[in-house]
């Protein structure tokens, strides 16, 4: 490994790192019931701030994770954010003032902030960074020189060799020698600076490429040593470095969880999920961070992503309902090019526009955050499955969820542990009555879910269900279809997908050829809508004619009786 002589600058840097220590560090793991993180991938800080106020706080998210804030190489590709040039807060997503404003705004909304932190390596190539800093590989003036890099100056090529994985270069990026005291102190100074700006924790990028002992030593210099860390350590069977090595430093992302969800939802039966978690060989629940997809896996294809339709949505519903790990809800943007950077340079003018997917705000997912918070600490109870892709389970006496991943409606009497009374199905906005014995009868349309919890007793105010003034539009359309086709509706409201065919809502064919769906909408809302059909491959065909129009009444549900226009 490289060695650097002790100098006066080292002493000064170490002192600076100590001086920067934040007085109030975050806890070692997400505390309390609010353990869900919204990962707003490549969102500008100003847009993150608005999301904290408008959607994340009200939905009950505990954390928001922001993309790497440090200065990086020039370029529009998303991965430029992961090639640091300096530790100035001067990337494409915003400057230091914008970052601080975002943190303060999110805190005011009750949302803590996690910063994606790139500390394993520096940029390759040469040029001028986004903050004006000149650099070339191995030389980053005022920060690093070649003496601070590992001696291996070639790319990683053998994941069965620990030294190769941790001392050589990840895709040719300059590998920092994190075993050296100066390097540890300088990295800690950067993280402590983020703490002083109000950050509550860190996602450590490429943790697997740094020895666990090095990360432990760095963390000891950050805050008071108990700051929340979530580490990226990808599992690979038979590899020399395993994710479990990092459990002593903080939480570790359990990549097998997401891979297995894809396999089960696409090729197996949901009934297999009955003991999902540690019984599958995963790391301990209390130390694991889980996700359906992240920015790498959605592009690499080893997990589900937004292109997988209801399978993706229902996997998210399951993750948020199931008591394993601390969930990350990835919220990114549409892509066809693997390298494409964020629309508008990261500015989100509105969800579901300009390619922004806003998964964190999808009603099917955001409604489950409140359920998860309500059911925190409750065990899985009253499991039911049909042996295939229809499952249901309770969370003690606090919640109950049913998921229908089949092509026909699920209609049955469910046994829950819920107290008797009225509940709002936060997935559909419909009222459900639970008997004194915990049973209730309901229909769950194909490709949808049902979710009840004690924090949402009514659909017209109270709890965490739809708020005061909420009613619904009941869509009924007579439409004949070919085998494999389904009918959807979309329109100019967020609840209707904002004209995005990928976010269109699937109607229930239980009364075929009449397709039905109830959608919660605020009383008095005027809206436009239109029906479309999708085949098994997801190809969409719109009905003909102009946009349909309607207005929700001030009381009661609006019923629409339509006929498909060929």
UniProtKB/Swiss-Prot annotation:
> What keywords is this UniProt entry annotated with?
Calcium, Carbohydrate metabolism, Glycosidase, Hydrolase, Metal-binding, Signal
Q: Which reaction does it catalyse?
A: Endohydrolysis of (1->4)-alpha-D-glucosidic linkages in polysaccharides containing three or more (1->4)-alpha-linked D-glucose units
Q: Which cofactor does it need?
A: Ca(2+)
Q: Which residues form the signal peptide?
A: 1-28
Cofactor binding, per record: Binds 1 Ca(2+) ion per subunit.
Report domain CBM20 positions.
Answer: 465-566
The site feature described as Transition state stabilizer is recorded at: 296
SUBUNIT field: Monomer.
What protein am I looking at? Alpha-amylase
């Amino acid at each position: 490994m490289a060695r650097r002589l002790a100098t006066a600058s080292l002493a000064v840097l170490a002192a600076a790192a100590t001086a920067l220590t934040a007085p109030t560090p975050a806890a070692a793991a997400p505390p309390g019931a609010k353990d869900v993180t919204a990962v707003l991938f490549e969102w500008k800080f100003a847009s993150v701030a608005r999301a904290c106020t408008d959607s994340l706080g009200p939905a009950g998210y505990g954390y928001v994770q922001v993309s790497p804030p440090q200065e990086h190489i020039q370029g529009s590709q998303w991965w430029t954010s992961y090639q640091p040039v300096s530790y100035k807060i001067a990337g494409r997503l915003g400057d230091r003032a914008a970052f601080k404003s975002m943190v303060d705004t999110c805190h005011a909304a009750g949302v803590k902030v996690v910063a994606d932190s790139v500390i394993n390596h520096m940029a390759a190539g040469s040029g001028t960074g986004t903050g004006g800093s000149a650099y070339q590989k191995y030389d980053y003036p005022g920060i690093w020189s070649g003496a601070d890099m590992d001696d291996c100056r070639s790319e990683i090529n053998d994941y069965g060799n620990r030294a190769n994985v941790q001392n050589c270069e990840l895709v040719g990026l300059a590998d920092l020698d994190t075993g050296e005291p100066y390097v540890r102190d300088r990295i800690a100074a950067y993280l402590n600076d983020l703490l002083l700006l109000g950050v509550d924790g860190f996602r450590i990028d490429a943790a697997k490429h740094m020895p666990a002992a090095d990360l432990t030593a760095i963390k000891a210099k950050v805050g008071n040593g108990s700051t929340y860390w979530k580490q990226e350590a990808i599992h690979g069977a038979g590899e020399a470095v395993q994710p479990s090595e990092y459990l002593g430093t903080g939480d570790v992302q359990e990549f097998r969880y997401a891979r297995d969800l894809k396999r089960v939802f696409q090729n197996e039966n949901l009934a297999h999920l009955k003991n999902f978690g540690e019984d599958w060989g995963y790391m301990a629940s209390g130390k694991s961070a889980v996700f359906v997809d992240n920015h790498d896996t959605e592009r690499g294809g080893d997990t589900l992503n937004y292109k997988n339709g209801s399978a993706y949505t229902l996997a998210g519903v399951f993750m948020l309902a199931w008591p394993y790990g601390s969930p990350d809800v990835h919220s990114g943007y549409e892509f066809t090019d693997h390298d494409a950077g964020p629309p508008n340079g990261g500015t989100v003018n509105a969800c579901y526009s300009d390619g922004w997917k806003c998964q964190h705000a999808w009603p099917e997912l955001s409604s489950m955050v409140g359920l998860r918070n309500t059911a925190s600490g409750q065990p899985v109870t009253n499991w039911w499955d049909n042996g295939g892709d229809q499952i249901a389970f309770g969370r003690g006496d606090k919640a109950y969820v049913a998921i229908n991943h089949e092509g026909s409606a699920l209609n049955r009497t469910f046994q829950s542990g819920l107290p008797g009374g009225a509940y709002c199905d936060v997935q559909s906005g419909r009222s459900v009555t639970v008997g004194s014995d915990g049973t209730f009868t309901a229909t769950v349309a194909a490709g949808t879910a049902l979710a009840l919890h004690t924090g949402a007793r009514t659909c017209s105010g109270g709890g965490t269900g739809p708020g005061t003034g909420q009613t619904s539009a009941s869509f009924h359309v007579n439409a004949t279809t070919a085998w494999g086709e389904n009918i959807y509706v979309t329109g100019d409201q967020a609840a209707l997908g904002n004209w995005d065919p990928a976010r269109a809502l699937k109607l229930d064919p239980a009364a075929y050829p009449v397709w039905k769906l109830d959608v919660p909408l605020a009383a008095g809302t005027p809206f436009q809508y239109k029906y479309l059909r999708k085949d098994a491959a997801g190809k969409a065909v719109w009905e003909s004619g102009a946009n349909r129009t309607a207005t929700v009444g001030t009381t009661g549900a609006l019923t629409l009786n339509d006929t498909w226009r060929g």
